[in-house]
A protein has these predicted regions:
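C-terminal accessory segments
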Residues: 34-37, 55-138
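Low-complexity, Ser/Thr/Pro-rich intrinsically disordered linker/stalk segments at domain junctions
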Residues: 143-230
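Extracellular beta-rich repeat passengers
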Residues: 1-64
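Flexible loop/turn segments at secondary-structure boundaries
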Residues: 42, 80-81, 139, 189
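Extracytoplasmic/periplasmic beta-strand context in beta-sandwich domains
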Residues: 17-19, 71, 127, 178, ...
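Extracellular carbohydrate recognition
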Residues: 27, 119-124, 227-230
Length: 230
């Protein structure tokens, strides 16, 4: 089975809603989703139950380009699953803006080669994840440069020499450069690597050279404008 461009939210507060992906058998091809586990729910099961996207990726080999971010639905409790957008969201036949701090990470995060031509402009040149991707009601894209850190957004542990960090980018190209930074305690930031291409958005991190901590954070920063970061 193929599973892509979906937002799957599992909430352990509701009986029977314990997994974003619960495998009973067969073959799964899953990627470019947004998987969110709340209140003790699990991302997926493969040789065990996995509460973090990173652990599910390692155990299953699936969802390597997927997210685990708050999808920022317009009104989740009211079942309005349009994505909040700083540039335009469909609401009862008209368009509204949600402000700069309310832009869904699922916008422009779908399968890169899937069609997006039914989405209104600006559409970022990439389909949105979720129910309204590639439809006239798709939430609109940002027109400024942006970065989104993907790896470990929902937590987890990285150790050793071969840890792949992933991020996504918009309105940036291969000549735009970024740097990777980390903080051991949420305080000062230390540069791990610089002069990396903003796209395709991957870096192998050797964590043995860094201070070990349970509070480590990492971020990706645009070198020409440090305000563009995540």
């Amino acid at each position: 089975s193929m599973l892509s461009n979906n937002i799957l939210v599992a909430d352990g507060a509701f009986p029977g809603d314990d997994f974003c992906i619960q495998m009973e058998g067969g073959v799964l091809d899953s990627d470019y989703n947004n998987l969110v586990a709340r209140n003790g729910a699990w991302i997926g099961n493969r040789e065990g139950n996995w509460e973090r996207l990173l652990y599910w990726q390692r155990a299953s080999g699936e969802d390597v380009h997927s997210l685990s971010h708050d999808p920022l639905f317009a009104d989740e409790a009211g079942w309005d699953l349009h994505l909040k957008s700083s540039t335009g969201r469909y609401l009862n036949g008209v368009w509204t803006n949600d402000g700069a701090g309310n832009h869904s990470p699922a916008i422009d995060a779908g399968v890169p080669w899937f069609s997006h031509t039914n989405e209104p402009s600006p559409n970022g040149g990439r389909v949105n994840i979720g129910a309204y991707g590639n439809t006239p009601q798709a939430s609109k894209s940002r027109t400024n440069a942006w970065l989104l850190a993907m790896t470990m957004n929902d937590g987890g542990v990285l150790k050793g020499t071969n840890n792949l960090l992933r991020w996504s980018a918009g309105n940036l190209g291969t000549t735009d450069l970024v740097r990777i930074e980390y903080s051991a305690n949420g305080g000062p930031w230390t540069t791990v690597a610089n002069n990396l291409s903003a796209v395709p958005g991957e870096y192998v991190w050797d964590t043995t050279t860094c201070t070990s901590s349970l509070q480590v954070l990492w971020r990706v920063v645009l070198q020409t404008n440090a305000a563009v970061q995540d």
